[in-house]
């Protein structure tokens, strides 16, 4: 270790090395995480590649602004428990973000070593820190918390709700988290497949939160099993972290044919099936032996592609309307999908699902990239006369999600914007306070469908806003 720690050129002598990955042929048959854990010496060597830049771009690109160079140094020195403590100062779910964040678009994408040497494996080290610390018996230190008589109801046990609960409980405010699902995590548990995030990770995190003092009321849907007004009466404040679940339609003919599936319904039903939760057997969709076309280019589309592979689909093709460089998801996930047998059709825009009584194919047109849109991405333009039909037995549509406001929002004075998102500005009198002063909100239902880590950040910031509101 001494020789390594004194080596200022570790980033040259030791190249970027990701954790060992299971062979594609093996993992394509398993709903299990595909990366092996880092060995301690490998994690330390990779962490020591960090240059400790005076202006750490990785830290600024991270939505929760993790103290990345600092905990990399602690790992390189073997100080895992200190690294875990530091990691949890900014992130409520570091072991989750280490697994599911698109680091190539965030921290690792801005690493100085990208130019010629390969970025530090920040995400893998982040995962290693918390997994190892928990295995060593580490738990968040709650010994200095002074408990108040305040309690806050949180609707949604996804990343935003858990981030909010984390901030509140560490400051002596009792969080009670309600969720319609039987386990915590929201789409972390019921949407993201186990080859990216094994569900034991969230089970462990639930136990940790409960030890800290967070109370969970699971299998309870507010508005169905309990009136929202009851929460307003019984709690000092309420946080909404209900996510975005509404399917974005393609708007083309044939979308209602048998054999066309909504991405989220498909993924949730598969997770329920794998975990053995009691649901309507008709909800589960097996694509075994079928020619599958997945429409979309984000991480949800990759989850659908790779799930279909594991179900034994005859073939899986992902069709996306822009080129590969413009895909919105993680490049790592695209590479994993390709290794596992997914084919890609780029610059293809769907115009109709073909079939009489069920899906027989998907009609697409070729596109070329034109002028940038309002987000700076080149718009796909249709190439005239380029229609073709891709044969298919099943089509999965993964175009993203929209907010689905609850019927009681208007009743309690929660205002929405033109896209159906809850108005809860970060820069308001209290961070993420809605138009009802007692109600706060954050995550996808405020910003629109986005990353896990941004939801964690907004939940934590809303927690700080609630503390200010309660004068704690």
Curated annotation (Swiss-Prot):
Q: Which residues form the 4Fe-4S ferredoxin-type domain?
A: 41-72
Q: Which Gene Ontology biological process is one annotated for this entry? A: L-glutamate biosynthetic process
One Pfam family, short name? Pyr_redox_2
The note describing how and how many cofactors are bound reads:
Binds 1 [4Fe-4S] cluster.
Cite the binding residues for [4Fe-4S] cluster.
50, 53, 58, 62
Q: Does the keyword NADP apply?
A: yes
What does the UniProt keyword field contain? Answer: 4Fe-4S, Amino-acid biosynthesis, Glutamate biosynthesis, Iron, Iron-sulfur, Metal-binding, NADP, Oxidoreductase
Catalysis: reaction(s):
2 L-glutamate + NADP(+) = L-glutamine + 2-oxoglutarate + NADPH + H(+)
**According to the UniProt record, what class of enzyme is this?**
oxidoreductase
What induces or represses its expression, per the UniProt entry?
Up-regulated at high salt concentration.
An MF annotation (GO) of this entry: metal ion binding
Q: In which pathway does it act?
A: Amino-acid biosynthesis; L-glutamate biosynthesis via GLT pathway; L-glutamate from 2-oxoglutarate and L-glutamine (NADP(+) route): step 1/1; Energy metabolism; nitrogen metabolism
Cofactor(s) listed in the protein's UniProt record? [4Fe-4S] cluster
The EC number of this protein is 1.4.1.13
Claim: Protein biosynthesis is one of the keywords in the record: no
Q: What does this protein do?
A: Catalyzes the conversion of L-glutamine and 2-oxoglutarate into two molecules of L-glutamate.
What is this protein's name? Glutamate synthase [NADPH] small chain
Gene name for this UniProt entry: gltD
């Amino acid at each position: 270790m001494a020789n390594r720690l004194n080596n200022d050129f570790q980033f040259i002598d030791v190249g970027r090395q990701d954790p060992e990955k299971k062979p594609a042929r093996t993992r394509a048959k398993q709903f299990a995480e595909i990366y092996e854990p880092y060995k301690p010496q490998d994690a330390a060597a990779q962490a020591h590649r960090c240059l400790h830049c005076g202006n750490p771009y990785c830290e600024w690109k991270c939505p929760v602004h993790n103290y990345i160079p600092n905990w990399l140094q602690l790992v390189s020195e073997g100080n895992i428990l200190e690294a875990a403590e530091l990691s949890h100062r900014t992130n409520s779910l570091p072991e989750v973000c280490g697994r599911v964040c698109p680091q190539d678009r965030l921290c690792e994408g801005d690493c100085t070593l990208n130019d010629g040497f390969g970025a530090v494996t920040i995400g893998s080290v982040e995962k290693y820190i918390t997994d190892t610390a928990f295995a060593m018996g580490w738990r968040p230190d709650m010994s200095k918390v002074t408990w108040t008589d305040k309690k806050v109801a949180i609707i949604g046990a996804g990343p935003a709700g858990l981030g909010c609960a984390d901030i509140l409980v560490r400051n002596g405010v009792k969080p009670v988290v309600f969720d319609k699902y039987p386990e915590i995590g929201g789409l972390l548990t019921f949407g993201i497949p186990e080859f990216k995030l094994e569900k034991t990770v969230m089970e462990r995190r639930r136990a940790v939160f409960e030890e800290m003092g967070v109370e969970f009321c699971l299998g309870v849907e507010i508005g169905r099993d309990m009136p929202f007004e009851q929460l307003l009466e019984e709690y000092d404040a309420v946080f909404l972290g209900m996510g975005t679940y509404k399917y974005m339609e393609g708007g083309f003919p044939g979308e209602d044919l048998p054999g066309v599936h909504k991405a989220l319904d498909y993924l949730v039903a598969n997770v329920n099936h794998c975990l053995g939760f009691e649901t309507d057997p008709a909800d589960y969709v097996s694509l075994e032996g079928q020619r599958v076309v997945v429409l979309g280019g984000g991480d949800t589309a990759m989850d659908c592609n790779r799930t279909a592979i594991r179900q034994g689909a005859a073939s899986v093709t992902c069709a996306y309307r822009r080129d590969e460089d413009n895909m919105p998801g993680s490049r790592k996930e695209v590479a994993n999908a390709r290794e596992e047998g997914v084919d890609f059709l780029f610059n293809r825009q769907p115009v109709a699902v073909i079939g009489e009584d069920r899906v027989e194919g998907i009609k697409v047109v070729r596109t070329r990239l034109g002028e940038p849109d309002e987000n700076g991405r080149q718009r796909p333009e249709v190439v005239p006369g380029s229609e073709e039909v891709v044969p298919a037995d099943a089509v999965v549509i993964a175009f993203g999600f929209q907010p689905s406001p609850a019927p009681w929002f208007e009743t309690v004075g929660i205002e929405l914007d033109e896209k159906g998102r809850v108005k809860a500005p970060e820069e308001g009198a209290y961070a993420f306070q809605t138009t009802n002063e007692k109600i706060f909100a954050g995550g996808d239902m405020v910003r629109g469908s986005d990353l896990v880590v941004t939801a964690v950040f907004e939940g934590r910031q809303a927690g700080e806003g609630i503390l200010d509101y309660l004068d704690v």
